Amino acid sequence: MSIYHGIIGSSDHIQNIFPPPSPRKNISLSTNNISSLTTPKNFTAIVVTKPLSQSTTSTQEMMNTSDILFDIQQPLSPQHHSRQIQQQQHEKITPEEEERRSDELQKILLDTIPILIKGVETLGIEVEQICNGDSANEKRSNCQVLVDIQKTLREYPRGMGYRSKTIPSNIVGKPKLIAFRHSMDQLVWENISKLSILKDFVEFTLDFQKLCVIGISIRDAINSFVNNKCEYLIKGFEFNNTNSILSGINIHHHLNHQPGASTPRPSHSSSSSLSHSLSSSPMSQSLPSSLTSGGVSLLNTSDDAIVPSLSSGNDDSSGSSLSSSDANVISINISTVIQNGVRDEINNTSISALKKSQKQQPVVLSRAPKQVMESTRILVDTVVNRKCMYREEKASIYREMMNDRLTLLKEDPKKFKQQLLQQRRQKLTNSDQPHETDYNEDFNLNNNSTNNNNNIKKESNGSSVNSQTTTTTTTTNNNNNNISPQHSGTSGSPSDKENSPIFSPGYLSTSPPKSPPKSPEFLGVPIGKKAHLLGHARSFSADTHATKEAAANQHHHSHNNIGSVLSPPLSSQNERILRNYKLLSSSPSSSSSAVVTNPVSLTTQLQQQQQQQQQQQTTSQPTQPPPSEYQLLDLEWEEPIDSDFILPCKGYKIDSGNSKCQQVNYDELIVLYTDEDEYHYCDDFCSLEHFNFLGVNKNQPDNPMCISVVVQHDTNELLYIIRTGEKDEKYRLSLPYGKKEISSKDMLKMIKKSRFNQMSNFKLKEVKSDQNQQFIKQLIQFEAKNIHKTFKFGVLYCSENQGTDENELYSNSSTSDEFQEFLRILGDRVQLQGWTKYRGGLDIKDNTTGTHSIYKKWRDFEIMYHVAPMIPCRAADEQSVERKRHLGNDIVLIIYKEGNTKLFDPSIIKSNFNHIFAVVQKVDPIPNVDGAAVINLGNSFNNNNSSNNNNNNNNNNNNNNNSDSNLPTTNNLPIITNVNYKISIGCKEEVQNFGPAFPKNHIFSTSTGENLTDFLLTRLINGERATLKSPVFAQKLKRTRKEFLHSFITDFGSE
């Protein structure tokens, strides 16, 4: 197992998690002489004590009966250090030992996390007592604990369902205090939610390394109480002032731990048990030391003075005089002991009392509902895996670059601005040339440093980056650039983790995942809060910069210019944002620099501006692949010379197949306009603090507008959704560098400046905070109504000699067996009474629209068929009003036609809603001269639906029984049992052409029933979506959108 290193404070202080043994210089002194010592820089004290019994009552007695061994650690040479790493890489433990330690650590965590949750709940109760500025100052340490815990658990996901607490009457009229109370209430909920989710994750996890990562986070959370002197709130630990002494103590097993040696589980507090588990296993060496060096460790509790005794077999290789089996080694920071003094007593609470107090703690369950707990565990597993693979060596390169930049900014701001301006001018001048800059240009503005960093090359054995950086970079395999789709995300299984290139050492950690599925109830907007702070979430890291650069220049930059550091893959959310949100300039093109210092020709200046705009357009949106041959054929409908089933008539188009198409490409059955099926507002805005604005055009009062804006921390951008009467527009704006705070008014000014021509005459007002919750729910419903993922298709039965009278088609109540077989291809027969899924307007209570219907769940869509013969109709009703009430409001009609005497005339359909007509007819198979049946197209495609295969077999058997006498049995012709269909598509002329295309006179076989279903549903869904884009429906949708927006302005935008 490799050892990771952490950079503590600066790059010249490196601390290993487990320091290798080194020669010691032991000096025995008494405790009374401690105050007169001056501690060297590389100085450590070793206190050798005997195991303390419960009768030990004071720290003073412990120190007086102890001997102090001062240890001067000799610095290790690089060769010695590399040998130590190689030795520890070969250390392994048996699977049984690892399983035992995992079980032990899991039990300790399950005992510790509820105590932390109870402590946070107690903090929430104390925060509720704040009623004025003085009481807020008194509770400052309690509030700081909440902030520190939130920072510790920032990367972990939270639950959903947050509700703001009511404001007490004694703070009404104090907006700052109200906002403060809301922030603290949200922190209490968020910390409890994350701790509860971690507890749930620990219950289902036995991976020791993952448990260690979570244990370190829990240790840091406990340190938040200790550092702010609020340890009395954690009742399960019974802290006292002894922590001020123990705050400088770190327990290390300097004794050589043999692989596979069992470590007895101590029967002390869960804190000391957790510390022993975290520090005694070689598995924990894979954790970065930056995670284990957070001030006071979880070892620093009152019971940590009692170290579990090691077996005597582990004392032989210690290299010191400590040979007794009951000896314990405690490394003490002498300066901390001298500063704090030995003045407190150690808590001697019995173990039974501790367990009793732990059992009394209430179990706090996760705030996330049960149906999303599995996805929540996956998010936690992603965070833990990222922490395990994080390497400080890679990030230290960027840290040095950032330090140089900040140093230059502090020393000479004027020079800093001049160099920045010079670089920007150089980029504009070279905008017509390929990009040759790399990440160093954005981070280091010092010319010398930039030149040095630009010349970094890949080295197989590692090389020094510069004189101030001690971290080395390793060679990365170029094949890692190609990441397969199945490896684009993290998986919880160890095999996926090992095989995935994302977990290779060349990759940095990705940005933290978002919370579980968003809830409309979680608003996250404190009442009265007008500003959004960015500084607390923008800690610089290499992966943040790499993500931003990859998003902006992924088609133009080569990532090999930064040595061996590769940019991490974009998260799925960032990819979706990059694909759907158009990048805008922070200032309009007309407001470009009007002052020209150098008399350059106006033509040259305009050319540079045009090149810059073209570059921005190409880099802001991913390039779309060119349409395939099949997609081009979808838009080419040939005029039928002789239509098979549909009678050509005025006002209608017919597609009976394309002569240029050779076969149906089932791999490219693409549904149109799927980019409009995403819930952008619900996914990107609802779970974050955001602002909403409403207004109308001053010159055109009938033109309303609604704007939502949120801050995207990962990319340091503002995301906008602009809703007008016509459509939703999605944009993103980059925030200026160094912008620490931005108000809602500034957000609105930025988008108005970028979209000046569109928004110059709009008067927009922010939705009030007390109405924002209800308004967000309205926006979620508004977005859901504009997403079209449920369909209702009508099905008519056309018997022989029918097709010229609409009432004849609607009056058919008895059907043939072939029609029933065709219905089984369309979907499943379901009972309507008690139906819980999409019902398509049918009655599911009283069976007034029939007892059964046909339903299909296909991809992400739901289809309910309105089968006319299955809907009850009175015999005396010649118009079949009950059936027309449903089928007449369907855009798509499927007509199953029998016989060849008459063609279907689409002009007989009187409904204005029916626009798409799919006529399907059964045809007899035509055998070849060789004696083989018609080519079965399904043989070249995989059909994985076993149930459909069984249904097809049953259908074939029924056909054998019913039509054996009609099959040819002479002339050596084979018996053919497959049923074949031919399809013709018709639509009104105002509907644009749609696909997928199919060959002329193509025959679909029942042996490929699922493929026939895929083709037919794709064609019909595309037809309905194309119809909604037609002028008639587009005008209705536009009018409906405007009515909704005007109602929002009336209800939420008034004074």
Curated annotation (Swiss-Prot):
Q: What is its main location?
A: cytoplasm
Query: What keywords is this UniProt entry annotated with?
Result: Cytoplasm, GTPase activation
Give the GO cellular component terms, alphabetically.
Answer: cell cortex; cell leading edge; cytoplasm
Q: What ranges does the record list as Basic and acidic residues composition bias?
A: 89-100
Q: Which GO terms describe its molecular function?
A: GTPase activator activity; GTPase regulator activity
* Composition bias, Polar residues: 483-494
Q: Which GO terms describe its biological process?
A: cell-substrate adhesion; establishment or maintenance of cell polarity; negative regulation of actin filament polymerization; regulation of myosin II filament assembly; regulation of small GTPase mediated signal transduction; response to cAMP
For bias type Low complexity, the affected ranges are 262-292, 442-455, 469-482, 603-622, 943-966
* Disruption outcome: Null cells show defects in spatial regulation of the cell attachment at the leading edge. They also have extended chemoattractant-mediated rap1 activation kinetics and decreased myosin II assembly.
Q: Does the keyword Cytoplasm apply?
A: yes
* Positions of the UniProt region annotated as Disordered: 76-100, 256-292, 418-525, 544-570, 603-629, 943-969
The Rap-GAP domain covers 779-1048
The listed locations are:
Cytoplasm; Cytoplasm, Cell cortex
Functional summary from the UniProt entry: Mediates the deactivation of rap1 and plays an important role in spatially and temporally regulating cell adhesion and chemotaxis by controlling attachment disassembly in the leading edge through the regulation of myosin II assembly and disassembly. Overexpression leads to defective chemotaxis.
Q: What is this protein called?
A: RapA guanosine triphosphatase-activating protein 1
Naturally occurring in which organism (per UniProt):
Dictyostelium discoideum (Social amoeba)
